[in-house]
Structures are given as C-alpha cells and as structure tokens.
C-alpha cells in the first residue's frame, strides 16, 4: 500500500479497537468464542473454568517470580560469549539484526556501552512486506549509532514462493505460526550467511524471553543446532529442494558449506537480561529514538501479520500471536482491554470474512493466494 493509505487503514483499525469495539461487541458476540477474563486467552487454546479463567492465570502467582527479571546463569553465559568475541572476527565480531524498533535500539545501545571492543555490523533484512513506518523508523534510528549498516532485500520472487508455500502449510502447522517462523528463518539465515562469508563469529538478535519460549519451547540465550533447522523441514516435514530452485537454496544457511570458523553462533541477550518495558522505553527516550506516534505495533508489523492471524483463527479457532500476547497481558506488560478488542476484531473477520483490509488482500494477491486458501469465505 501507499504510505498514506496504509496509515489510514491502521489508524482506523486502532480507533475501532480503542473506541468503537466495546459498542460493536454485542452485535458481533454470536461470532466470538469465550476468552479468559484476565489475559484474553481464547478458549479454543486454553480451556476456561466456571469463572472464565484459564489455567495459566490460575497458576500465575506460583510462577510470577521465576518468570521475570535477569537470569544470572544465562547472563553470565552471554557476558562470557560477548567478552570473548571482542576482536575475534576478521573485520567484525558480530552481525547485529536491527529492526529500528525499541528493543533492537535498546540492545544495540547496551552492546556498544558494555562491550566497546565488539565490532558490530548492523543488518536489516527487508522481506518486502515491511511496513513503511518500520522502514522509516529503522533509517531514522540507525543514524544515531556510529556503526556500519547493511539493508538486505532478498529476491522478491523467492520471497513470494517462500511465503506462498508457508501460508499453504498453515492447516498442517503444529504449535507456533509457520509463516512467522519462516520470516524469522529468512532473517536469521541471511544473517548467518553474511556472518559466515565475512568470518564473523556471532549473530546477535533481539528476541525476548516470551518469544523464545513460545517459538522454541524453554528458555535459552543461544540457538542450538536444532533451533537452526529450517521449520519447513523440522516441523512440516518438507524437502526444500522440492519447493525451491537451486538459486533459491542459496538463501538458506547450510553448515556443510562452511569451515568451522564459518559457523556463527546466534546469541539472544535479552532472554538473559529480560529488561522491563519501562526500562526499554526509558533508555530509548533518553537516546531520543522514540518517535512520537510511530511506536504502535500495528504501524510497524509486517504486512502479512494480520493475514496470518486471520488464517490461523479460521483454521484453529485462535492464532499464535494471541498465545504470546495473552502471556504478556498476564505479566502486566501490555493492557488487557485494548488487546482483547484487537483479538476479537480479528476473530470476527476470520469467522465472517468481513472487514478484511485492503492491505491484507494485497498480500494475498502478491503471494498468488485466494481468500479460500487462507480459510476465508
């Protein structure tokens, strides 16, 4: 979409979620399933008790202290890895995956402050579906850091084949969103390939504890070899060569192509540090990197995120993002009412086929998909 139209659609959606949806809910109620009254988790994912509360909320006090704050063991591992990496590469010691969002700005600043000997190359991987606001934010934010920066945009034809295939795999997916995982795989493999070619020992990314737990299961601050496996192979049982051309295959990271020094480790420091949202915002504000009106995730999400959400609800009755965000609601990191409204709006669209945005329809067209391909009427 053109930026002006994109902004109009997002702001209209946001306005409905904030102001109008509570008034529209009674009309839409017959199309909505019950949700946990504490965290908004959908009953299709998390069965509710007689009081309308999911088991995770019933158990939250037991786990509250264990789930929050720095993990000293992981933090020590991260510190040892980053300290040892300083000066150990050829021209760079770490490829840093940069999005321009507040988490990546926070992490990059901490790396520069705490590990001044770490020679960092920032990398933005643009899959062609990034929002114009996210791209603007990244361009504006990177200018505040004295750092080398590369923006990489993979072959659009390959990207279309990849995400078209991933969307068609949604009905067979197990667990977290296969489309979102493949977006991550494209990003991580692009970074690993670059690091391997430049003999850079580390790739550093800004995944947080909740994200890692939801995507991979468990909590760890470094990718294992199993985590590196392509989800189309590991989770969907596909053979990549049957779906991608030899030219396409070069986009995927293959450990066998590289000598030992060309097998970069992938580090996730925020899993160990687990800063609060307030800490992140305070630092980003202090750096002057918080652009007023540009921080809403609806403005910065990839264009296919709403399509994933609608398709998963149509297929399973809930979507992967509800699982992640309901956990954030339980942890007090995001507000219940606003996100419950958003969840219900997506659910209504998925069940009725109504109010599907122009942006979502454009994504389908670019990927060669129909409404029926994603489960819509």
Cite the ranges covered by each PLM segment.
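Short, glycine-rich nucleotide/cofactor-binding loops
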Residues: 94-103
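Nucleotide-activated chemistry modules centered on ATP-dependent adenylation/adenylyltransferase
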Residues: 11-94, 110, 114-377
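Hydrophobic positions on the alpha1 helix immediately C-terminal to the Walker A/P-loop
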Residues: 106-107
């Amino acid at each position: 979409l053109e930026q002006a139209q994109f902004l109009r659609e997002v702001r209209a959606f946001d306005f409905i979620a904030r102001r109008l949806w509570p008034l529209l809910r009674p009309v839409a109620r017959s199309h909505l399933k019950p949700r946990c009254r504490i965290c908004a988790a959908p009953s299709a994912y998390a069965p509710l008790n007689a009081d309308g509360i999911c088991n995770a909320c019933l158990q939250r006090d037991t786990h509250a202290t264990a789930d929050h704050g720095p993990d000293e063991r992981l933090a020590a591992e991260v510190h040892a890895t980053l300290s040892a990496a300083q000066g150990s590469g050829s021209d760079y010691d770490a490829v840093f995956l940069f999005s321009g969002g507040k988490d990546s700005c926070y992490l990059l600043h901490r790396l520069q402050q705490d590990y001044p000997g770490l020679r960092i190359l920032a990398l933005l991987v643009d899959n062609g579906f990034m929002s114009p606001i996210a791209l603007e934010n990244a361009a504006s934010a990177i200018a505040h850091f004295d750092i080398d920066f590369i923006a990489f945009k993979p072959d659009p034809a390959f990207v279309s084949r990849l995400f078209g295939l991933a969307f068609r795999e949604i009905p067979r997916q197990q667990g977290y969103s296969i489309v979102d995982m493949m977006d991550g795989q494209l990003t991580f493999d692009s970074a690993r390939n670059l690091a391997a070619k430049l003999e850079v020992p580390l790739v550093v990314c800004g995944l947080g504890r909740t994200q890692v737990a939801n995507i991979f299961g468990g909590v760890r601050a470094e990718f294992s070899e199993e985590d590196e496996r392509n989800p189309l192979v590991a989770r969907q049982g596909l053979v990549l060569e049957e779906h991608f051309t030899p030219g396409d295959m070069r986009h995927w990271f293959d450990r066998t192509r590289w000598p030992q020094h060309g097998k970069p480790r992938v580090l996730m420091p925020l899993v160990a540090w687990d800063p609060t949202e307030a800490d992140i915002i305070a630092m980003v504000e202090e750096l002057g990197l918080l652009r007023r009106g540009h921080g809403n995730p609806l403005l910065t999400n990839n264009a296919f995120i709403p399509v994933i959400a609608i398709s998963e609800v149509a297929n399973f009755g809930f979507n992967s993002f509800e699982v992640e965000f309901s956990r954030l609601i339980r942890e007090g990191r995001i507000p219940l009412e606003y996100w419950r409204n958003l969840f219900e709006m997506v659910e209504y669209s998925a069940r009725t086929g109504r109010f599907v945005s122009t942006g979502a329809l454009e994504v389908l067209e670019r990927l060669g998909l129909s409404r029926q391909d994603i489960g819509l009427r």
